[in-house]
Swiss-Prot record:
InterPro entries: Epimerase_deHydtase, NAD(P)-bd_dom_sf, UDP_G4E. Gene3D superfamilies: NAD(P)-binding Rossmann-like Domain (3.40.50.720), UDP-galactose 4-epimerase, domain 1 (3.90.25.10). The keyword Nucleotide-binding does not apply. This is UDP-glucose 4-epimerase.
């Protein structure tokens, strides 16, 4: 199967492309570096994907395309025959989405609608969408299952765009019963490929916990602010479901494996997480252990909308996709630290 991967140069994208190639799929990668660092070679190829080519020994074709640019996207579809789409491209910083809601609604929805329209026009019927645990809002129950309430109390435009896109894809799937739509609700991806050649290289100050912690550990940032230590959790700090990015990437491969094996599956929704929650302090302590570095912390006030605990029940993905997260906390942190120490300046080094 030939797969178009949008947002392919980023953290999740590069790891997903690697797992697709290792599983016998072929890919075309597109990205416009809205989130990923725009580090390219003299030919305009993404450094992250060049490293994927190095790791797999396979060709990784790449085009610098903004999915919001309908004409550029149409050119991609008119020149290639795709069997399926993995749609990862989106603006993704929760805090920024609150400050710039229109930018998020415009970018994330227009990009996705353009892509769906091209799929309809060029008869591409298999669509795997990068969704998020944010669609659940503050959890009404723990662990969160795929049947848990969605769309209520979502505290930021980023999460709203993911929820809206889910609804649009569910409706498109109903109207086009020959389509296969898989909505993958990610929890908190961390870690990096074992080689240390690819990993998370955020623009500016990291928005996510673990890249921030690792940059404090290596000395790029002075101190970690923990937002709240009075939650009803094991140590007062927020608990989340952290999943190794390689395990997450394999979930996308399993989605296409299921489509290949079963045929017409309609629309299916899966949580991709470990089912185990770790607190901020537990994550910091684990990285301290693997790095041997001190990680200074200070306590700040909780951010608006922060909840005590979020973790999922991943058993549906285990049952139907034959997928489970295999990597434990210490290994996640060791792989992150390996990436950070080998690439202290990210892909810019």
């Amino acid at each position: 199967m030939h797969i178009l991967v949008t947002g392919a140069a980023g953290f999740i994208g590069s790891h997903t492309v690697l797992e697709l190639l290792n599983s016998g799929y072929t890919v075309l990668c597109i990205d416009n570096f809205a989130n990923a660092i725009s580090v390219t070679d003299e030919h305009g190829n993404a450094i992250s994907l060049k490293r994927v080519a190095q790791l797999t020994g396979k060709d990784v074709p790449f085009q610098n395309v903004d999915v919001c640019d309908e004409a550029a996207l149409e050119k991609v579809f008119s020149e290639n025959k795709f069997d399926g789409i993995i749609h990862l491209a989106a603006l993704k910083a929760v805090g920024e989405s609150v400050a710039k809601p229109l930018q998020y609604y415009s970018n994330n929805l227009v990009a996705s609608l353009n892509l769906i329209q091209m799929c309809l026009k060029y008869n591409v019927k298999n669509f795997v969408f990068s969704s998020s645990a944010t669609v659940y809002g503050p959890p009404s129950e723990l662990p969160i299952t795929e049947k848990s309430q969605t769309g209520q109390g979502i505290t930021n435009p980023y999460g709203q765009t993911k929820y809206m896109m889910e609804q649009i894809l569910i409706d498109v799937g109903k109207a086009n019963p020959e389509w296969n739509v898989v909505l993958l609700r990610y929890f908190n991806p961390v870690g990096a490929h074992k080689s240390g050649l690819i990993g998370e290289d955020p623009k500016g100050v990291p928005n996510n916990l673990m890249p921030y912690v690792s940059q404090v550990a290596i000395g790029k940032l002075p101190v970690l602010t923990i937002y709240g230590d009075q939650f009803d959790t094991v140590d007062g700090t927020g608990v989340r479901d952290y999943i190794h990015v390689v395990d997450l990437a394999k979930g996308h491969v399993k989605a296409f494996d299921r489509i290949k094996t079963v045929g017409n599956i309609g629309t299916e929704i899966y949580n991709l997480g470990t089912g185990v929650g770790y607190s901020v302090r537990q994550m910091v302590d684990a990285l301290k252990k693997v790095s041997g570095r001190d990680i200074p912390v200070k306590i700040g006030v909780p951010r608006p909308g922060d909840v005590a605990s979020v973790y999922c029940d991943p058993s549906l993905a285990q049952e139907k996709l034959g997928w489970r997260a295999e990597t434990g906390l210490e290994e996640m942190c060791a792989d992150l630290w390996n990436w950070q120490t080998k690439n202290p300046q990210g892909f810019s080094a």
